[in-house]
C-alpha cells in the first residue's frame, strides 16, 4: 500500500527549458492615404541564410487608417541570417491586387519607418503584378 503511494507522490521532477532570449523587429507603416477604405496590410519578415531568402515571420492587419505600429518578437536563434528584410503590401479588403508596397532592410531593436509606395494604378489596381500571380516571394 505504501509503495504505490510513494511512487505517486515521488513522480517525475523536470526543469523547464531555459527561455531563449527575444528581440523585437518593429516600427510603423505609413505613406499612403486609405481614403476611408478598409485595407489589408501584409508584412513578411525575411532572413538571408546562406545566400537564400527565407520567410521567418508574417503578420496581417486589417486597417482603416495609417500609420500602423507593428512588431515581430523573435527568438534570437531565429535570426541566424546575414540580413533581415521586410516586405509590406497593402490591398483593399475584397480586392486581391496590391495597391502599394515597400521592401526594405530592417534591424532588430531599431524603430523602423516603412513608407509604402503606391503602384501607378493606385487606388484602383485590379490586376496582380507578375510576381503576385506566380506566388513567388
Curated annotation (Swiss-Prot):
CC per GO annotation: cell outer membrane
Gene3D superfamilies reported in the protein's UniProt record: 2.60.40.2990
Coiled-coil annotated spans: none
Pfam family membership, one: YscW
Ranges that cross the membrane: none
Signal peptide feature range: 1-14
Keywords: Cell outer membrane, Membrane, Signal, Virulence
Localization per Swiss-Prot or TrEMBL: Cell outer membrane
Effects seen without this gene: Deletion of the gene causes a diminution of T3SS needles, a decrease in secretion of T3SS proteins and affects the regulatory gene operon. It reduces T3SS activity toward eukaryotic cells. Mutant shows reduced virulence in a mouse pneumonia model.
InterPro entries linked: Pilotin, T3SS_Pilotin
Similarity comment: Belongs to the ExsB/YscW family.
Domain notes: Displays a compact beta-sandwich fold with interdependent beta-sheets. Possesses a large patch of basic residues that could play a role in membrane recognition.
Protein task: Involved in the synthesis of the type III secretion system (T3SS), also called injectisome, which is used to inject bacterial effector proteins into eukaryotic host cells. Pilot protein that is required for the proper localization of the secretin PscC in the outer membrane. Necessary for full in vivo virulence.
Protein name: Type 3 secretion system pilotin
Amino acid at each position: 500500500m505504501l509503495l504505490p503511494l510513494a511512487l505517486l507522490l515521488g513522480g517525475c521532477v523536470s526543469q523547464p527549458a531555459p527561455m531563449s532570449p527575444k528581440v523585437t523587429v518593429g516600427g510603423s507603416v505609413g505613406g499612403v492615404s486609405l481614403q476611408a477604405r478598409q485595407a489589408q496590410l501584409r508584412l513578411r519578415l525575411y532572413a538571408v541564410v546562406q545566400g537564400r531568402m527565407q520567410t521567418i515571420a508574417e503578420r496581417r492587419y486589417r486597417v482603416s487608417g495609417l500609420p500602423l505600429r507593428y512588431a515581430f518578437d523573435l527568438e534570437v536563434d531565429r535570426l541566424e541570417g546575414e540580413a533581415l528584410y521586410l516586405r509590406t503590401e497593402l490591398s483593399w479588403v475584397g480586392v486581391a491586387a496590391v495597391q502599394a508596397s515597400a521592401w526594405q532592410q530592417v534591424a532588430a531593436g531599431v524603430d523602423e519607418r516603412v513608407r509604402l509606395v503606391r503602384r501607378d494604378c493606385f487606388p484602383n489596381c485590379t490586376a496582380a503584378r507578375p510576381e503576385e500571380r506566380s506566388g513567388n516571394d
